Amino acid sequence: MAEEGLLLPASSTSSSSSLLSEISNACTRPFVLAFIVGSCGAFAFGCIIGYSAPTQTSIMKDLNLSIADYSLFGSILTVGLILGALICGKLTDLVGRVKTIWITNILFVIGWFAIAFAKGVWLLDLGRLLQGISIGISVYLGPVYITEIAPRNLRGAASSFAQLFAGVGISVFYALGTIVAWRNLAILGCIPSLMVLPLLFFIPESPRWLAKVGREMEVEAVLLSLRGEKSDVSDEAAEILEYTEHVKQQQDIDDRGFFKLFQRKYAFSLTIGVVLIALPQLGGLNGYSFYTDSIFISTGVSSDFGFISTSVVQMFGGILGTVLVDVSGRRTLLLVSQAGMFLGCLTTAISFFLKENHCWETGTPVLALFSVMVYFGSYGSGMGSIPWIIASEIYPVDVKGAAGTMCNLVSSISAWLVAYSFSYLLQWSSTGTFLMFATVAGLGFVFIAKLVPETKGKSLEEIQSLFTDSPPQDSTIF
């Protein structure tokens, strides 16, 4: 296991061929449609994240915003994230995955229109707040829905590919933001959600949610529609129903609602999920995402060239991660991704240090561009998607809603802290700010290497039993 954490399997080529065969067999029309709908939330999320940086200058100029006003616009998104996180678990458990997707897409549309027609800061912030609430719900909902409908051998690839849509959304809006006016760009942001709404009439509900709410008779029918009418889904349906019944019996004995998550048996899974979710945020993700324009300008890089280059690299990283997640495994990609983010933060700090001390002035812009590209490429290859994949895999159905709320809260609060404080941290010390982020990334690498196990190739029920029965003993590479 120690070697598996660092090296790609020797049979990666044959594994890739097998993966392609499995993908071909699994691509039934209902599954593909459900996958696309589940992935569109990630794309909408990416569009929202990618909107701020390229439009910063024009929005501030057109609406006469101060730095404090724009800092609020950037950070109020995470206030909405916190509000969405507070309700996401209860909402998805109460009304189901599909109806919750309805709610998030309607909020996305309203938020974009509010921004597009804003004449002052209040409507601008209201639109951003509504978008934040929707993201706070969908950022966990999407991975959960996809992992619950996907076959076990494709679960990682499907979830990672879905999260790749977030990287695509960021990249598309980074690029469009250099040529499209900010109001028109907001109108374009409505299109994905408007396209999803009619498709929601044709996708199935999660079979695991159906089992949880007592609709056992529908589980096998939904699995047949997802896997194909000729597939034998009896074993999969039996495993889902058996495990759900076991969880219900435990819930009857101990029904403490949200606080049930804090029992000793969930301590390991809660720690893994929460720390993995928080690492990208505390490692400066929102700082890079919302203020890339400021970083480029401060170090002498052309903003348009920087945005386009960064977009291409992030998309490439996301594609690479999607291809490898079910071949090399989640853990290997997490380690490589986290190491790359550490390198990106460190070289960004060095570029600011050189700029501030007037050293190597001709090379500093190149180093700054390189550092941002390394950061986003590394983030896209692993830390952008895999923490949410793991978080959607490791919690039993009875605490999945509470766990989703907790993970979302941690992500949202840490994102808000970074987004709101980032501009002030840059004024304090640009070099010191990115050294802080590099330190977090380095500590995150050690955490993953020491504690995070591999979940590739296991059913959700096997993973959840593994995490709740006893912490895995074979996760360390040191």
Curated annotation (Swiss-Prot):
It is a multi-pass membrane protein. The chain crosses the membrane at residues 31-51, 67-87, 106-126, 129-149, 161-181, 185-205, 267-287, 305-325, 333-353, 366-386, 406-426, 432-452. SUPFAM superfamilies: MFS general substrate transporter. Its main location: membrane. Keywords: Membrane, Sugar transport, Transmembrane, Transmembrane helix, Transport. GO terms for cellular component: membrane. GO terms for molecular function: sugar transmembrane transporter activity. It is found in: Membrane. The keyword GTP-binding does not apply. InterPro entries: MFS_dom, MFS_ERD6/Tret1-like, MFS_sugar_transport-like, MFS_trans_sf, MFS_Trehalose_Transporter, Sugar/inositol_transpt, Sugar_transporter_CS. It comes from the Eukaryota. Sugar transporter. Belongs to the major facilitator superfamily. Sugar transporter (TC 2.A.1.1) family. PANTHER family: PTHR48021, SUGAR TRANSPORTER ERD6-LIKE 15. This is Sugar transporter ERD6-like 15.
